[in-house]
Each structure stands twice: as structure tokens, then as C-alpha cells.
């Protein structure tokens, strides 16, 4: 029996959009405060005082709608994957749905699975559309992640997200899913208990038994079941908590770094958690050619990975310029110091 996940009707992406806040803090500025001189990234994004996961999701959703060119009322589900929702009890997806004019005839929910909550929403949307229950569903991955002051996570925990509108594969879809595969184990590498402000992690335990075990198994299984090798893919996007991990995963799997670098943004915007691979794939779609095949592999602590094989279609050529591109947001930046960063992130407890 095949391990692949395939819907009864083929599903594609009819619209996508990303958003990254414009504020940045350099890793060396964080290091200056804490006396650290080696850094996992160059700089990271910081949300503005009036930005949160919902506003990031709204901006990304609006960009996705611009490319999809459909009436938002046709969207029958909006699912937001995040681990930093503004409300403990109140859905964020409903706010996004209202803001883009999609209410009231739709389903909305918030998904959680650490950093792979966004691709959990993608998997659900593929099933929803692929089953014929709906013709359009939106999946969003967005976060405004936090790191304890002085902890090495503080150097990478960032903000950003992306939205994807899924539809039955047609000449209007700009890419389609060949198949997907999910792999999960009970691996307590990273967690945050209720009422705690910052997450805790298992240091080195987050690497080999968590990130690499899930990523490698998910990617290998998907490729083996499809009969593909790294040579069959033009791009590969892996979850990117830093720069080192995805490049190491690529090397283990046999992908040259040239296929990874176009979607590897963590070095210049940080780890956007649930948005990480969704933003990375959006950057690849901004430059990909029809016929290109993309390997997309997420990771979420706790732990698990979703792997997708995505094939770019002709419609990408006419649709990608209908909304701001991912690098437009990456290159739009305003640097702040640690004091302003602490203010923006609510690190002052009065």
C-alpha cells in the first residue's frame, strides 16, 4: 500500500502571497547586549507595535487574493497555522476571514503543531478541496515567535507568514501538488507550557533526533514512493530555524545548495516558525519557471514533518506579478536597536 497522500481530484495553488514586517535587528546587536560573538543568522524581522499574527495573515491573504483573482466569498475555508496567536481562546482565522471579505459562508480554524502548523493547514486544505467539499480553501502559516532574552533562540525567532489559496488543478492554477507525505513521532524537543511567556528547548536534542530525523524520513519517503531522486527537483525548501540545518539536510539527501538557496531566507529574516517554509516556497514561486518541480518539507517540534512535491504550471508567468513579491518585503527594512526591539516584543515586564 502506498504511503503517499493523494486526493481524489488533483489540487493546485491558484494564489499565494507573503508578508514580512519591515523592522530588523542585526544578530550582532543582540550579541552586543549578551556578550555573544558568533551568530546563526545575519539579522531577523521584528513585528511593529501594531502587528501580530492576525495582521500578518491578513496581508499575506490579500496578496494571495490578488494573484488568485477570485471573489473571496468563494473561499469555503480559512485555516491559520500558528503558535503565536493573539488570543488563547478566540479564533484568529475568523478575523482574517472578515478582513478579506470571505464571511460568513465558510469554515475557519486555527491549527497548531509548532513550526509545521502552516503545512498542517495546507494538508487539510488539499483534502478539503481534493474531496470535492469545496473549490477554494485558504491555508496560512504565520508567527511572531519569541525567544527568552539571552537564549540562542532570541537570535532567530522572527515574524512573517504566507497564505495559499488552493483549488482544483486547472489552467488557472499556478502550481499543483503531485503528492504529499506526513511523518510524526513523540519527540519532546521544544515546548511552552500554558501561562509561560517563552518556550523551552532541549538544546542539541532539537537537532539529530528531532529536526533531522523527521525531515530526512519525510523527504526520503516521499521521493522513494514517487520514484524520484534529487535530480528530479529544481528547488528544495526545508524548514529553516537557521541557515545550517536546512543546508545540512540538503547535503544528507543529496541536494546541491544551489537548489536550496533561493528559498532559504532565515539568514536575513530569521525563523518565521509556522511561516518558514511557506515564505520560502513563495520566494521560489516568484522566480520558478513552468515545469519546475519543488520539494517542500516542513518541520514542527514535538515532532513531525510534512513533505510535498509541487510542480509549477504555465499560469505562474502571468500571476506572480499581480502582488508584491517575497523579496520586496525582505528588502524593505528599517533597523532598530535592542532597546526598541525589546519594546516591540514586550520584553519589558513592568
Curated annotation (Swiss-Prot):
Lineage: Archaea, Methanobacteriati, Methanobacteriota, Thermococci, Thermococcales
Biological pathway: Metabolic intermediate biosynthesis; (R)-mevalonate biosynthesis; (R)-mevalonate from acetyl-CoA: step 2/3
Residues at which (3S)-3-hydroxy-3-methylglutaryl-CoA binds: 115, 156, 206, 239, 271, 301
Keyword Signal: no
Binding site for CoA: 204, 244
A molecular function (GO) term: hydroxymethylglutaryl-CoA synthase activity
The EC number(s) this enzyme carries: 2.3.3.10
Name of the top EC class for this enzyme: transferase
BP-aspect Gene Ontology terms: acetyl-CoA metabolic process; farnesyl diphosphate biosynthetic process, mevalonate pathway; isopentenyl diphosphate biosynthetic process, mevalonate pathway
SUBUNIT field: Interacts with acetoacetyl-CoA thiolase that catalyzes the precedent step in the pathway and with a DUF35 protein. The acetoacetyl-CoA thiolase/HMG-CoA synthase complex channels the intermediate via a fused CoA-binding site, which allows for efficient coupling of the endergonic thiolase reaction with the exergonic HMGCS reaction.
Protein's job: Catalyzes the condensation of acetyl-CoA with acetoacetyl-CoA to form 3-hydroxy-3-methylglutaryl-CoA (HMG-CoA). Functions in the mevalonate (MVA) pathway leading to isopentenyl diphosphate (IPP), a key precursor for the biosynthesis of isoprenoid compounds that are building blocks of archaeal membrane lipids.
Stated family: Belongs to the thiolase-like superfamily. Archaeal HMG-CoA synthase family.
HAMAP family in the record: HMG_CoA_synth_arch (MF_01409)
Protein name: Hydroxymethylglutaryl-CoA synthase
Entry annotation: catalytic residues: 83, 115, 239
Origin superkingdom: Archaea
InterPro entries tied to this protein: ACP_syn_III_C, HMG_CoA_Synthase, Thiolase-like
Pfam families: ACP_syn_III_C (PF08541)
This protein's UniProt keywords: Acyltransferase, Isoprene biosynthesis, Transferase
